[in-house]
Each structure stands twice: as structure tokens, then as C-alpha cells.
């Protein structure tokens, strides 16, 4: 099993007192499997992704990723897992304005010490970005920038891809096209994909679907 989440809890302190965002979440994901995570705003979807991605730590429970217990790691260990094992795509593209598209795509792979020029070129080609490689992010449309962000995430060949509304800034038809491309490329790498989405149409493109309600899997 690529990912096993067991009895995960997370509580934040608010002005009104403690707020339990996650209240004992369990899930599993196999290598090569795609899973949609749906739910209302505030149900804990993004928090769950942040915990799995090592961007935050749970109050209790376990996250075992690729044989490593993330909850037993320190900050440096979680950072290493983010570089070497996990790829993250957010709704905001967060491309580097001063870098050409070719270098934006290769950026994460170079940080991880896993840069493969041929694979980056393949990603650019499959995403329809080859004509844009010498351009800068500001010269691309929103849909093109999101394709760059996805290619950048896949460039290091992560074992697990976490996607938080990765096509949220796109219209429904374009979003479906971009997700289809992303699913093809994820399948080529054998990675697992866990995606947060509000779209029933996009969730339907995934192999499995889980629904979060008030911090629990419904």
C-alpha cells in the first residue's frame, strides 16, 4: 500500500475555541490509484492534504507513505519526503515569474536532484507546451500556466501526487481536458493521485471517491 492514513485528527484554536477539523480519518491509496476527495468548504479536505504532504502535523493518528511513518519524522525528514516522494499541485499556479517555462517545469526536479531533461521534454510535449518553453509565465493563459504547474509537479516522478483543486481557476470543459492529461501522465509514472475537488464531473474521472463531512469520511 502506497499510503495508509489511520485515525487522523487535527484541531485548531479559533476565537470561538477549539475546532476539530479532522476527527479520526482513515484512508488508503495504492500505487497507480486515483482518488477524489470531496466535501463542503471547511470539511477538512485541504487540511488532510497538508498533513499527508508533511506541511503540517496531526494531533493524533498515523500517516504511512511509501513505508515511512510521516508522523515519526522531524521537520527535516518531512521536507525530504516532500522533495523526494510527494508532488503537490495547488489551485494557485505559483510559477516563478523570472524563469522561462522550460526552467519552471524542471525546477522541482532539480531541487530533488532528479532532473531528467528527456522526461521534462516529454511532459512539455504531452501538455502541449513545447511551443511555449522559451516564454515566461506572464505570456501564457491560465490554462497553459496550470499545465506548467502540473508538469513541474510530475517532473521529479513523485510516488504520490496531491492535488488541491488543481483546475479550480479553469472553466469546466478546460478543467476536464487538463485533468485527463494529468491522469494519463500520472498513470505513466505509476504514482498514486489524491485530488481535492468540488466538481462531481472531475471526481467522476477518478477511480475512487471519498466524501468528507465535518472532519469524518462519510
Stretch-by-stretch model annotation:
Residues 2-3, 8-212:
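ABC family nucleotide-binding domain
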Residues 214-218:
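Conserved switch/coupling elements of ABC/ABC-like ATPase nucleotide-binding domains
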